[in-house]
UniProtKB/Swiss-Prot annotation:
Cofactor(s) the record lists: Mg(2+)
Any one biological process term the GO annotation gives: DNA-templated DNA replication
Residues where Mg(2+) binds: 13, 108
Highest classification ranks of the organism: Bacteria, Bacillati, Mycoplasmatota, Mycoplasmoidales, Mycoplasmoidaceae
Protein name: DNA polymerase IV
Species of origin: Ureaplasma parvum serovar 3 (strain ATCC 700970)
Reaction(s) catalysed by this chain's protein: DNA(n) + a 2'-deoxyribonucleoside 5'-triphosphate = DNA(n+1) + diphosphate
Family: Belongs to the DNA polymerase type-Y family.
Site features described as Substrate discrimination, chain residue numbers: 18
Xref: Gene3D superfamilies: 3.30.70.270, 3.40.1170.60, DNA polymerase, Y-family, little finger domain
Cofactor note: Binds 2 magnesium ions per subunit.
Subunit organization: Monomer.
EC code(s) of this entry: 2.7.7.7
Presence of keyword DNA repair: yes
Length: 360
């Protein structure tokens, strides 16, 4: 991949993370179709199937009874969230050895800016990607897929082209053949609802979405994100990897592929968000004393709840318990479409320590 003064962005994604870790914990189920799911729920939902289960049509967010119809031999394993967190922590520690230009986006994926890093590998980006893959496999026994391009959107799409354990590189010469012919539902963060709205106005492929003659009608569907998305898909985006910037707020949210009303499943998704924002908090050497959680319903009505802490913290467990308590107060067995976590009123960790020393 030639640089030509463009950024080189890598997207790293652990393959079938929950299912793979659970499989490592239960080697007796190796080569069996397995899925992590909510065993005790009245409306049990699949959280993460392994690739063998996926070959039967089993998908994340699918009701367990339906997954069992598709794959009668499917083995359901309970969530082991503390262990997932441990694997996630070690994964990001390994990546951090390569560069501090890392943006963690969930418990099992991140972006890195490899523009300068690749120079240490004879400007051979595939050599760098292969080295990272091998180290993750040797140390954690996990496979990862890597997508490489000149912005985050296309790098993430590249990852999906060659899963599992793949390395996909999309440069300017390949984007037309590899990306523009794809269905719009392959675009990151374009959910099922927006995809259906675009289908309704006869927009099916990415090349149709970026066509100038369709701008007006697509803008009515996508609103303010339209132009940034088109810039990304055309390679015009200048968005940086978030690394050592000073934040006023650190937040992360997830729109579900399907609306959820299962407390267990929503809690699992929320746990991932909490881990993501606390990882960012620590990486930036910041602390917070104010947290908030927000949920959005299928009607697009939004509910927000905030809590002021009595002291500054960057501790995962403290933030986890505070957010969990807020969620228990605000959640009333409703169906929700999106959940988000925000850490507010951030200060540098060193400044908090200075304040504490004044009272020693």
């Amino acid at each position: 991949m030639k640089n030509n003064h463009q950024k080189i962005i890598m997207h790293l994604d652990i393959d079938a993370f929950y299912a793979t870790v659970s499989e490592l914990l239960h080697p007796e189920y190796k080569n069996f179709p397995i899925a992590v799911g909510s065993l005790n729920s009245r409306t049990g939902i699949i959280s993460s199937p392994n690739y063998l289960a996926r070959s039967y049509g089993v998908k994340a967010a699918m009701p367990i009874f339906l997954a069992k119809e598709l794959c009668p031999n499917l083995i359901i394993l309970p969530s082991e969230h503390n262990i997932y967190q441990s694997y996630s922590k070690h994964f990001f520690q390994i990546i951090n050895k390569y560069t501090n230009k890392i943006e963690i986006t969930s418990i099992d994926e991140c972006f890195i800016d490899a523009t300068d890093l690749v120079k240490k590998y004879h400007n051979n980006i595939r050599l760098l990607a292969t080295k990272i893959q091998k180290e993750i496999k040797n140390k954690l026994n996990l496979s990862i897929s890597i997508g490489i391009s000149y912005n985050k959107t296309i790098a993430k799409m590249a990852t999906e082209l060659n899963k599992p354990s793949g390395i996909s590189i999309i440069d300017e010469n390949k984007i037309i053949n590899l990306i523009y012919e794809l269905n719009i539902n392959k675009i990151p963060y374009i959910g099922e609802i927006k995809s259906q709205e675009l289908y309704a106005i006869n927009i099916f492929k990415i090349k149709e979405l970026i066509a100038t003659e369709n701008k007006q009608k697509i803008s009515l569907v996508l609103g303010s994100i339209y132009q940034n998305l088109v810039n990304d898909l055309k390679g015009l985006s200048k968005i940086k990897i978030i690394d050592e910037d000073i934040y006023k707020t650190i937040s992360h949210s997830k729109t579900f592929n399907e609306d959820l009303n299962d407390f267990y499943e929503i809690s699992n998704e929320m746990n991932d968000l909490i881990l993501t924002v606390t990882n960012r908090l620590k990486k930036c050497n910041l602390m917070t004393n104010n947290i908030s959680i927000y949920i959005k319903y299928p009607s697009f009505k939004t509910k927000i709840k905030q809590k002021q802490l009595t002291y500054y913290t960057d501790d995962y467990q403290t933030i986890f318990l505070a957010i969990k308590n807020l969620f228990k107060i605000m959640y009333k067995d409703e169906t929700i479409r999106l959940i988000g976590i925000s850490l507010n009123k951030l200060v540098k960790k060193e400044n908090v320590k200075k304040q504490l020393f004044l009272f020693d």
